[in-house]
Structures are given as structure tokens and as C-alpha cells.
Amino acid sequence: MENVTFVSNSHQRPAADNLQKLKSLLTNTRQQIKSQTQQVTIKNLYVSSFTLVCFRSGKLTISNNHDTIYCDEPGMLVLKKEQVVNVTLEEVNGHMDFDILEIPTQRLGALYALIPNEQQTKMAVPTEKAQKIFYTPDFPARREVFEHLKTAFSCTKDTSKGCSNCNNKSCIENEELIPYFLLFLLTAFLRLPESYEIILSSAQITLKERVYNIISSSPSRQWKLTDVADHIFMSTSTLKRKLAEEGTSFSDIYLSARMNQAAKLLRIGNHNVNAVALKCGYDSTSYFIQCFKKYFKTTPSTFIKMANH
């Protein structure tokens, strides 16, 4: 019988142990990176007003049916009103910082009036060819002017009588300067061929916008087509027909207004989901969450976590 020598593999264990430790280290590293970088995508966000987004940190991708803009450096996004966009927000090292400013229609009219007539004619581009999402790089004093306008729009009335919610004299004194502040913010944007047509079209109030504004003025109310028709002194049949001519319907606008209001309240961070549901006309919180998720493709809790940055 031949001698058989059994060789122990004990000398291979350190190598196996090191490999296991390496796998564990890589797993932990991936988990740490994942915990530091959170991402959420919000779909079907209706842009009801000419909107500026002050982007400070993180990563942001915004798109519609034709345009896609990717941001990973500080700057400002310009969004034409009455479009539907998808937004992806991503933290970088745990940080995501941005702010939103919706420009009232009448303010755009005042801004457009500052542009020389020959420049308006020269730079006008047909609506169907115009881009609807733009990015402009950061520049000195942009953030300060952005913050000033945000304060002014939240404090002042639509007229030039000054501030209605506080005693801040600067709100009253700077009322007439608001169009010039806007002009300063949009300097880079106004160099683009499409800019003047976009400002002009956004300064005009469509029937869709009128209906949207009526519903948004009281989102908790259970609106009906007849209610809105009475507000604008129009028959229900005429209202339906004219909205169809603009490519929309009362039910679509109603849902957009309620969901946008919900997103706005959740982004501010002063309301919990139950309160937001009630403020947007939903008696059932669970049904509201269901509608929110179906509309935006994300849950209210996930939206709050990212948007509150």
C-alpha cells in the first residue's frame, strides 16, 4: 500500500481571511457611499409660472419631451411656464441645495417693457422652435438679488402700494426696482435668441393659467367645472371647448393644481403629510399618498427628504 500524505490547508486560511476582509471592506464602503449619496426622481411636475431655480450644490437633471439639462455646478435654471418636466435630485457628500422663484405674470410684462422694441423684434423666435429649459452659470451678486426678489414677491402685493405682510421698508422702496433686478438676474439668459419670445409668451395669461390660478387660490375646495365657469363668466361647454383648443382639460388642470400645491407645501417643510392632504382637498391621507405617488412617481416622504434641502 502506498504512503499517502495529507497536506493541511491551514496555511491558506490567512489569504482567505484577507479576501473576506477585503470583500467586507468594499461592501461597507459601497454602503457608506450610498448613504452619502441619495437620489430621487420627481416626474410630471407642472411648471405653472415662469420659474427660476437657484442651484447651489448637489446634482440636478431636469427634462421635458425635448430638452435635458444637467447641473453639477452653481448656476440658475430658467423654465418657461406651462410645461411638464421630470426632475432628478442627487445629493453630493450629503448636500443638495437649491431654491425656487416663481415670477408673477405681471412682473414679466414690466420686464419685457424694458427691452428695446428693435431688440424684441430681432430676437423673437417662433414658440414651437423655442427651447423651454435653460441653464446660466453663476455670477457675482446673483444669489443676493435672487434672495431679495424672493423676499419681495412673498411680501408685496401685486400693486405698487408696498408690503402687506411686514414693515420692511426696503420692500416698499424697491418695488419699482423689481423689473431691473429681474433684468440683472436674466442677463445671461437674454443673450439667447429664444429668450424674448419666452418672456413675451409667459407674460400673456392663457385660459389654462386662469383656471389653474382659480383652483390654486383655494386648493382645499372641491372644485367643479361649473364653479370655475362661473368665476370666468363662461358656459361650461365653452370652457371645455376652449381648454381643449389649448390641449388640456379641466380635470388635468385640477389635478396639476392640487399636486403642485402639495409639492410646494411639502418642500417648504412646515406641514406634515396629513395637513398637506387636507389643504389640497383630500379627506383621506392614504388616498392622497396614492395620488401623489401615481402623479410624481415618488412618495411624499421621499419627496420631503430631498426637497427640504
UniProtKB/Swiss-Prot annotation:
Residues 209-306 form the HTH araC/xylS-type domain. The keyword S-adenosyl-L-methionine does not apply. GO terms for biological process: symbiont entry into host. Keywords: Activator, DNA-binding, Transcription, Transcription regulation. GO terms for molecular function: DNA-binding transcription factor activity; sequence-specific DNA binding. The keyword Signal does not apply. Residues 226-247, 273-296 bind DNA. Disruption phenotype: Decreases invasion of host cells. SUPFAM superfamilies: Homeodomain-like. NCBIfam families: PRK15185.1. Activates the expression of genes on pathogenicity island 1 (SPI1) that encode virulence proteins involved in invasion of host cells. This is Transcriptional regulator HilD. The gene is hilD.
